[in-house]
């Protein structure tokens, strides 16, 4: 991808250089034609055009590299962009979900967590059990 952009930049540079050399040559038109019909670039305009092309190319390349770096390293990137319903993709998605579960902070909820379990006093907690055993 970058090679195509680089080749396009080199072609544009070559065309600008050719235009600069042809502007110094004798005009191919006759003197009867008006000067407004000629479309030639001065050296200043050619330099400005070349500068604009180079700046645009560098900006596009840097944005593309940032986008690739962000997408390539992200675990949250959607799996649908990479593949769909393949066993390796399903395993990859499951491993990502497992990784997310392992890295998220734990919350103190559930049956095995420490903390206040009941608000009943100890003497009243097992009172009903004693009555049921005495009846047997």
From Swiss-Prot:
- What role does it play? Causes a rapid but short-lived drop in the level of calcium and phosphate in blood by promoting the incorporation of those ions in the bones.
The molecule here is called Calcitonin-1
Q: A single GO CC term, please?
A: extracellular space
User: Span of the secretion signal?
Assistant: 1-25
Q: Name one GO molecular function term.
A: calcitonin receptor binding
Sorted alphabetically, which PROSITE patterns does this protein's record hold?
CALCITONIN
Instruction: List the cysteine pairs that form cystine.
Output: 83-89
For the biological process aspect of GO, one term held by this record is: activation of adenylate cyclase activity
Q: Which domain of life is it from?
A: Eukaryota
Maturation-removed propeptide residues: 26-80, 119-136
Q: Which residues in this protein are found as Proline amide?
A: 114
Entry keywords, A to Z: Amidation, Cleavage on pair of basic residues, Disulfide bond, Hormone, Pharmaceutical, Secreted, Signal
Mind telling me which SMART domains this protein's record contains?
Answer: CALCITONIN
Q: Which Pfam families match?
A: Calc_CGRP_IAPP (PF00214)
The similarity annotation says:
Belongs to the calcitonin family.
State the compartments where it is located: Secreted
Q: Which InterPro entries match?
A: Calcitonin (IPR021118), Calcitonin-like (IPR021117), Calcitonin/adrenomedullin (IPR021116), Calcitonin_CS (IPR018360), Calcitonin_peptide-like (IPR001693)
**Disordered: where is this region?**
101-136
Does Signal appear among the keywords? yes
């Amino acid at each position: 991808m970058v090679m195509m952009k680089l080749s396009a930049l080199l072609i544009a540079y070559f065309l600008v250089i050719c235009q600069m050399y042809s502007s110094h040559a004798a005009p191919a038109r006759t003197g009867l034609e008006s000067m407004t019909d000629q479309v030639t670039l001065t050296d200043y305009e050619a330099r400005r055009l070349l500068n604009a092309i180079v700046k645009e190319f560098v900006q596009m390349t840097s944005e593309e590299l940032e986008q690739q770096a962000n997408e390539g390293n992200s675990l949250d990137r959607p799996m649908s962009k990479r593949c769909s319903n393949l066993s390796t993709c399903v395993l990859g998605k499951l491993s990502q979900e497992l990784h997310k579960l392992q890295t998220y902070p734990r919350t103190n909820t559930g049956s095995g967590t420490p903390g206040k379990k009941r608000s009943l006093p100890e003497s009243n907690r097992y009172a009903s059990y004693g009555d049921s055993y005495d009846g047997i």
